[in-house]
Amino acid sequence: MAIEQQHIITDKTLIRAAKAVSVIFTPFSIPFVAFLILFVFSYLRIMPLQYKLIVLGVVYCFTILMPTLTIFLFRKINGFGPGDLAERKRRYVPFILTITSYIFCLLMMHRLNIPWYMTGIIFAALIMMIICVIVNLKWKLSEHMAGAGAIIGGLVAFSALFGYNPVGWLCIFILIAGVLGTARIILQHHTLGEVMGGFAVGLICSLLVLHPFCKLVFRLFNIFLSVSYTHLT
């Protein structure tokens, strides 16, 4: 068993760098970073500062602070270390705690009448986590890479919505995604398949929820179902 737990890569500096990358680009930070980018680099920067601070405060509390605190308490109560949650069977409770926080975040944003293209970021992340929980029954997807895929999908979706060229940002975040995926493999937290699978889940969820074309297709499909139901009755 001791041989199986050893790192294949023995370079301690490389392992420390991989750990630092994993901590910096934690999945918890993805929604907050997405909102921050929107408020700084898109036309949403013209919104009142007070409004932006309220939205960022809500997102921070429910997507970073609450999940981090509840998972920390869960670890302390059960005597788990940070690495113990890498085991597939121990990931369900952290997932459920995070999903609960995101649901409360959506409810709060709904009460504040925040536009759909903002709440859609949280909704896409929520769907992504639910899929990860289901897949986790048999396989361990990388949540870090799911978050990276969601960011890239969100960039494509918002570029279509707001009409800007996303190539520069896409190059940056694709590079970050590659570094992050490599770090997860170096730390032996995931295989290449789990890294690629997580990225695909995040990318698809983000595009389906946020991209205007997908929303148009869903709307047309709903109209088709309504018309078909009317004719049948």
Regions found by a protein language model. Give the residues of each.
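Core segments of transmembrane alpha-helices
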Residues: 97-106, 147-152
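Membrane-embedded catalytic cores of phosphoryl/pyrophosphoryl-handling enzymes
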Residues: 115-225
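Juxtamembrane helix-capping/reentrant segments at transmembrane boundaries
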Residues: 81-97
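The first (N-terminal) embedded transmembrane alpha-helix
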Residues: 21-41
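Loop-to-helix transition at the N-terminal end of transmembrane alpha-helices
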Residues: 48-64, 88-89
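Membrane-interface helix termini and inter-helical loops of multi-pass transporters
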Residues: 42-50, 80-83, 111, 215-225
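Conserved small/polar residues in nucleotide/adenosyl-binding loops
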Residues: 230-233
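Short, Lys/Arg-rich, polar N-terminal cytosolic tail immediately upstream
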Residues: 1-17
